[in-house]
């Protein structure tokens, strides 16, 4: 990597973010594509978010990725939203186009690209969690023609999600069922009617926690996914695998959302398969 007077800067903005693998992905992509840029991780407090976003313009950065907990809040500070970000109501990529900050959402595209040989059109989806990344997956599923969407979260969080999910449902013209994960009968019923079941809660990152009971029974033929990539197999995925189901972790989503963000910021195609091999080696997956 060379650093000179022409080097451009990009970053990921979030809190916490020191654990992020995004700098590894983007800096490797810059090296492989001979792009004179460097990608850093910025851990930003909420009261400094507006200034951090304005710095993208001030320092003529290529752009920035936005992670939790700022995917909705960042919208206030942008000049324009792409259609997917507008429909979903969350942004994970900001691109500096001639001093105009444009927000995109590549999370949903990245997730569904990671599901090889699976297409959501006409199928049913059940998802645990309703945060920014979950919203992106739900929104992309509706754009891609999903038949039925059931979202489960803790009962005391439902009121906080109601307005945002309602707005997304209205914008996309598709109903969303928002239910309490404590209602095990409703959860079991929804999963039994589903083709895809996703854990988007973050539970399982510790290698121990489960978002569902340990005696939960999955229906045959269900595809089970977890947005977590470390550990490579969460307890949620292990439970599904032990019942003979196909499982997918979050590594592909991480890579392919970055691929689209890289393309938006640089205009170049990311050498994704080479980077994927390096990621697997780095994470010892």
UniProtKB/Swiss-Prot annotation:
Its EC number is 1.1.1.25. One of its GO terms (biological process) is chorismate biosynthetic process. It is an enzyme of class 1 (oxidoreductase). The keyword Transmembrane helix does not apply. It holds the Pfam family SDH_C. Shikimate binds at residues 20-22, 67, 92, 107, 229. The active site is at residue 71. Homodimer. Involved in the biosynthesis of the chorismate, which leads to the biosynthesis of aromatic amino acids. Catalyzes the reversible NADPH linked reduction of 3-dehydroshikimate (DHSA) to yield shikimate (SA). This is Shikimate dehydrogenase (NADP(+)). It comes from Streptococcus gordonii (strain Challis / ATCC 35105 / BCRC 15272 / CH1 / DL1 / V288).
């Amino acid at each position: 990597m060379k650093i000179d007077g022409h080097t451009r800067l990009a970053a990921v903005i979030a809190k916490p973010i020191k654990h992020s693998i995004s700098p590894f992905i983007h800096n490797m992509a810059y090296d492989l594509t001979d792009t004179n840029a460097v990608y850093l991780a910025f851990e930003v407090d909420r009261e400094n978010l507006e200034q951090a976003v304005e710095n993208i313009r001030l320092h003529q950065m290529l752009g920035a990725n936005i992670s939790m907990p700022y995917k909705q809040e960042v919208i206030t500070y942008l000049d324009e939203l792409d259609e997917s970000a507008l429909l979903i109501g969350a942004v994970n990529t900001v691109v500096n186009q001639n001093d105009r900050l444009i927000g995109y959402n590549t999370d949903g595209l990245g997730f569904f690209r990671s599901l090889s040989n699976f297409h959501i059109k006409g199928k049913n989806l059940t998802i645990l969690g309703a945060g920014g990344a979950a919203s992106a997956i739900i929104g992309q599923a509706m754009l891609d023609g999903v038949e039925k969407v059931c979202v489960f979260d803790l009962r005391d969080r439902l009121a906080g999600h109601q307005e945002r999910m309602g707005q997304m449902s209205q914008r996309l013209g598709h109903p969303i069922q928002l239910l309490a994960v404590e209602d095990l009968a409703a959860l079991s019923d929804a999963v039994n009617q589903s083709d895809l079941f996703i854990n988007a809660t973050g539970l399982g990152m510790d290698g121990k926690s489960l978002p569902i009971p340990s005696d939960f029974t999955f229906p045959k033929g269900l595809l089970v996914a977890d947005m977590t990539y470390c550990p490579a197999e969460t307890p949620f995925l292990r439970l599904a695998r032990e019942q003979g189901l196909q499982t997918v972790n979050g590594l592909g989503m991480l890579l392919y959302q970055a691929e689209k963000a890289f393309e938006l910021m640089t205009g170049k195609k990311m050498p994704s398969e080479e980077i994927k091999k390096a990621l697997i080696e780095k994470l010892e997956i």
